[in-house]
Amino acid sequence: MQELKGIGASAGIAIAKAYRLEEPDLTVEKKNISDSEAEVSRFDEAIARSKEELEKIKEHALKELGQDKADIFSAHLLVLSDPELLNPVKEKISTDSVNAEFALKETSSMFVTMFESMDNEYMKERAADIRDVTKRVTGHLLGVEIPNPSMISEEVIIVAEDLTPSDTAQLNREFVKGFTTDIGGRTSHSAIMARSLEIPAVVGTKAATGTIQNGVTVIVDGINGDVIIDPSAETVKEYEEKHNAYLAQKAEWAKLVNEPTVSKDGHHVELAANIGTPDDVKGVLENGGEAVGLYRTEFLYMGRDQLPTEDEQFDAYKTVLERMEGKSVVVRTLDIGGDKELPYLQLPKEMNPFLGYRAIRLCLEEQEIFRTQLRALLRASTYGNLKIMFPMIATVNEFKEAKAILLEEKEKLVKAGQAVSDDIEVGMMVEIPSTAVIADQFAKEVDFFSIGTNDLIQYTMAADRMNERVSYLYQPYNPAILRLITLVIEAAHKEGKWVGMCGEMAGDEIAIPILLGLGLDEFSMSATSILPARTQISKLSKQEAESFKEKILSMSTTEEVVAFVKETFK
Amino acid sequence: MQELKGIGASAGIAIAKAYRLEEPDLTVEKKNISDSEAEVSRFDEAIARSKEELEKIKEHALKELGQDKADIFSAHLLVLSDPELLNPVKEKISTDSVNAEFALKETSSMFVTMFESMDNEYMKERAADIRDVTKRVTGHLLGVEIPNPSMISEEVIIVAEDLTPSDTAQLNREFVKGFTTDIGGRTSHSAIMARSLEIPAVVGTKAATGTIQNGVTVIVDGINGDVIIDPSAETVKEYEEKHNAYLAQKAEWAKLVNEPTVSKDGHHVELAANIGTPDDVKGVLENGGEAVGLYRTEFLYMGRDQLPTEDEQFDAYKTVLERMEGKSVVVRTLDIGGDKELPYLQLPKEMNPFLGYRAIRLCLEEQEIFRTQLRALLRASTYGNLKIMFPMIATVNEFKEAKAILLEEKEKLVKAGQAVSDDIEVGMMVEIPSTAVIADQFAKEVDFFSIGTNDLIQYTMAADRMNERVSYLYQPYNPAILRLITLVIEAAHKEGKWVGMCGEMAGDEIAIPILLGLGLDEFSMSATSILPARTQISKLSKQEAESFKEKILSMSTTEEVVAFVKETFK
């Protein structure tokens, strides 16, 4: 028996035989060719057959996984008809009189390196697409069979270095019980697909393909990120029980889909979801989300080479508001800069982007971008229950200035006969420490706060949460963070305003009892965390949690808080 | 009459005729030469004559400005005998058979670009030295007279693009009443020299040489950074009065050199100085400093290619402690990373260095560097009144761990028979917001706090203080900052501990009344700010300042606080 540690990318436990998805040997040698015309048509032939295959996979994905997953293969089909990729390959074949495999390899690796060097998640995913498409076309050129997971006809756990989008799209849930890969993380394609398919998955093990042989029994625990190879009968039994317990828990969660979130002693809080695109609303409703607590609008601006138009934005906001059917939607205005770059804005390189010219700072300076977004929101406001919040506010004057611009645009629209809702709540993110310290001053100006704990923790501890060397300082349970959260909640309630939280902490099982006791009104998290959180809260007493408030706030370290919460709220 | 705006680099007002320090025309053309041997000896000849001149300037600087200013010319003399510069020039003359001027120009500009590309203040100064030396040698090669400010024999104000170290070293205070340059800032050579010579100076005007003609009357106001060209009689009179008022004020300040710092109602606080090298102690004592509130030890590590030895550090700490003659010296342990890089440590490039692996984070990880510094400090402790503080502490555990390492090293030294003082106070910098928010927890562990407001403001407002685009958020008077400072002072005093401040805010005339009212015990600032601060405090009543505490802390913006303080403490 052997154990591997990886990243739990999709919850659940699977036990089955290992099926190694062998990377086909696609080693390409440079060969000189005489008839380049014949070689170019051989290349075209391979492109055509790849397109055929992708059309079939896209169909399968649409049926099994829904539109946005199928869209990935539309992107692949676009790559296959992109002259920017194909022409240089053909030119290379003719000018250098080299074989098509080599010309393709050279051209595509140039694109992959370029995209991967861009410090931007979206462009890295484009690199994965190009690598995936190149593999498929090269397979046809070399006459090498590309493994086709959809052909699997017995219960298996897939073992691979990484799963390309087309691999994961072909996974047939009936037989593929789970998978484990060497590389990848929670946000890579394979992980996102596993969660949609609800197939347990552990990624980033670094050693799956090196250790697991074909046919050997494997256990994949996607909750804790463990992979057990050739387990003893006893271990298999233990994990079967865990699997059943997980299924029971999932069933328990499912019962609460349409229930409100109420503590044991009758206190109601709102569980909302964080979303990035209109397509995410489906997941919110399926998981019993009572609202959207954070709509990150920057996705509308990313992965393109110019700003989205007012109408494009209007359509997106309108769709989300309509799909949420009157449930509240809190939209965060543009938060780019920091680690979210928009190449087409050509913002200057900064030594410390997280402490730089981003979000509301940029919007108050380059107002046309800001006003376009606000107009689109105001126009969409009549299609649902819209709330607007500004990110990265540091001073009271910044909030006042941003709100004044909103009201100015509203006035212009109303004058021009445009219908605009009259009860749009306007609030702000509390993610900069100064706003928590004098929350009483901000509470007079806002309709609500939403605490962005990811950044609030980062600035309060002066530690970049993306920097592994200082990640030990990213401490959500540090008493300093809990005291700042308390300041914000008390200040808001004193002015009759509500407080939500949209950082990862809001869905964290250790934080939830504390936050309930501190009086948080709304918890906004990733959709899949909502039902577990609702179940947890239903077993907690708000009064009991509140009774521990002073004790927790007077502790001096994270370790003390965690130990106390685990002990008290077992 | 015309006005220019620049940076007030050295206080005081000067009125005199303009003396343009013309940059000699040193344009160099590439010429092919036949006899390279003769050309090399022509080059050697020019080097020799430059050395002679520099020896004379060094002597003059030693007499007029003291050792550390003279050291600059030792550095220049070193450059003139540095084979790494000279050999490539001679090789270029022989291999490319080009004239010495061209060979020198090519080689030195390569070095200048390399040094200037290093994001490090010290290396940029090295670039200025090489440019200065190259100018001198090229002058000799071209037979062009380099202007020699020491030849000036009437009262003048020097007007130049920039003043090289050798220019400023030759300034004869008897005639040179002040100067103004196009480029440079508060920390450039010329500014530092002007302050030592106490010659009024305005740098960074961008337009001095472009606007001011030789012989025209010029007023230089080094306090406000203003330059007035061809002033009316009335303006001259106005500035003469300002000049006399400034001299009177300086005389008033001078009376308090050896006086304690006491408010109008008898409350004593300690005014200390921030220093970077042992040579700075002279300025501390000359300006009536009661202690060193911050000894930045990173200068010992910079501008070299390996770590300083334990003995090198011991010598530096011992010298400072001895020169301070029993007055307290608060030494900050190593604070590198962020904008202070040590190339020889090869630390990984970080996306946000100010939120990264720096200071105590690095020292707790790479303990040998930390332990070496602590041993040097402990050994020096018997030579004066040493206090030690750790920078960039974020959690209580970090402080406990750092203090445990100090006590471990102390135990080892004592066991080995080394004398170590028994009353070394151990404290910490409060510059990370978390430590201010739960200052009551830290106050149980430390002997004192020193509030590092430069970084505290930066993290609390999430705005990089070196980034011009967000500099408006660097707000020392923001009520959030003042409330954090209050938390720290109240927490410390409750535990019977003292609180100092070593950010720029401590010497700021708007902040001083507020800080006095909040109960700050020690104000540590640049030496030249001490006497003005002592004078200001002597006219303030602590009780009166304290009575405004609640009012100020309940304000919502910086602007409100500044207006109130200006109005109340006129």
Swiss-Prot record, chains A, B:
UniProt note: domains: The N-terminal domain contains the HPr binding site, the central domain the pyrophosphate/phosphate carrier histidine, and the C-terminal domain the pyruvate binding site.
Main localization, broad class: cytoplasm
UniProt EC number: 2.7.3.9
Binding site for phosphoenolpyruvate: 296, 332, 454-455, 465
InterPro entries with a match to the protein in the record: PEP-util_enz_mobile_dom, PEP-utilizing_PTS_enzyme, PEP_util_AS, PEP_util_C, PEP_util_CS, Phosphohistidine_dom_sf, PTS_EI, PTS_EI-like
Protein name per its UniProtKB record: Phosphoenolpyruvate-protein phosphotransferase
Subcellular location: Cytoplasm; Membrane raft
SUPFAM superfamilies: Enzyme I of the PEP:sugar phosphotransferase system HPr-binding (sub)domain, Phosphoenolpyruvate/pyruvate domain, Phosphohistidine domain
Keywords, sorted A to Z: Cytoplasm, Kinase, Magnesium, Membrane, Metal-binding, Phosphotransferase system, Sugar transport, Transferase, Transport
Any single GO CC term annotated in Swiss-Prot or TrEMBL for this entry: cytoplasm
Encoding gene per record: ptsI
Naturally occurring in which organism (per UniProt): Bacillus subtilis (strain 168)
